């Protein structure tokens, strides 16, 4: 399986970079993971009407340009569908059975994702009603993808 993580912004903190490196290593026997980062816009300091929408539009344009061809697109969205780890594993397994082996997960920036990016997604996925920093969400997503492959293969998983 080929999985693209399309993310707004770069990881800067060492602990997040180490966690990302660890999960990419753990995932290497199961899937080819490609990280694609697009530039994050600065959020406006003022509450000027339309400023947030302008940020979403700029980031959204960058994201849409980088979505690989012929892939199943999954946008992380706090208003999306919530799945258990087993349900998520089942979803990935079903995609594989249907021959859909190219996936693209999209993680927005601080402002979230533009409506046109959400509309492009085959699935809008939520991990919780909580709001997480988008940098941390990347690590949580990698962990859940790893857990899903362990579930699919019937392998034990303990950290």
From Swiss-Prot:
Q: Which reaction does it catalyse?
A: pseudouridine(1915) in 23S rRNA + S-adenosyl-L-methionine = N(3)-methylpseudouridine(1915) in 23S rRNA + S-adenosyl-L-homocysteine + H(+)
Which GO MF term does the entry hold, naming one?
rRNA (pseudouridine-N3-)-methyltransferase activity
Which residue stretches, if any, does this entry annotate as coiled coil? none
- Can you name a GO cellular component term? cytoplasm
Positions annotated to bind S-adenosyl-L-methionine:
76, 108
Q: Which of UniProt's keywords are assigned here?
A: Cytoplasm, Methyltransferase, rRNA processing, S-adenosyl-L-methionine, Transferase
Q: What InterPro entries does the record point to? A: Alpha/beta_knot_MTases, RlmH-like, tRNA_m1G_MTases_N
Subcellular location, record wording:
Cytoplasm
EC number assigned by the record: 2.1.1.177
Q: What does this protein do?
A: Specifically methylates the pseudouridine at position 1915 (m3Psi1915) in 23S rRNA.
Q: Which family does it belong to?
A: Belongs to the RNA methyltransferase RlmH family.
On assembly, the entry states: Homodimer.
The record's section on NCBIfam families has: PRK00103.1-3
Name assigned to this protein = Ribosomal RNA large subunit methyltransferase H
The UniProt gene name for this protein comes to: rlmH
């Amino acid at each position: 399986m080929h999985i693209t993580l399309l993310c707004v912004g770069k990881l800067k903190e060492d602990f997040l970079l180490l966690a990302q490196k660890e999960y990419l290593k753990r995932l290497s026997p199961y899937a080819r993971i490609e990280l694609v980062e697009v530039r994050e816009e600065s959020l406006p300091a003022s509450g000027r009407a339309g400023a947030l929408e302008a940020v979403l539009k700029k980031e959204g344009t960058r994201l849409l340009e980088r979505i690989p061809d012929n892939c199943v697109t999954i946008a992380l969205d706090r208003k999306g569908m919530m799945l258990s780890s087993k349900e998520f594993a089942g979803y990935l397994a079903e995609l594989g059975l249907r021959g859909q082996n190219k996936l693209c997960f999209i993680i927005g920036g601080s402002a979230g994702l533009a409506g046109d990016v959400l509309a492009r997604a085959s699935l809008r996925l939520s991990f919780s009603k909580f709001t997480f920093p988008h940098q941390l969400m990347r690590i949580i997503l990698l962990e859940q993808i790893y857990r899903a492959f362990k579930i699919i293969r019937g392998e034990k998983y303990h950290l």
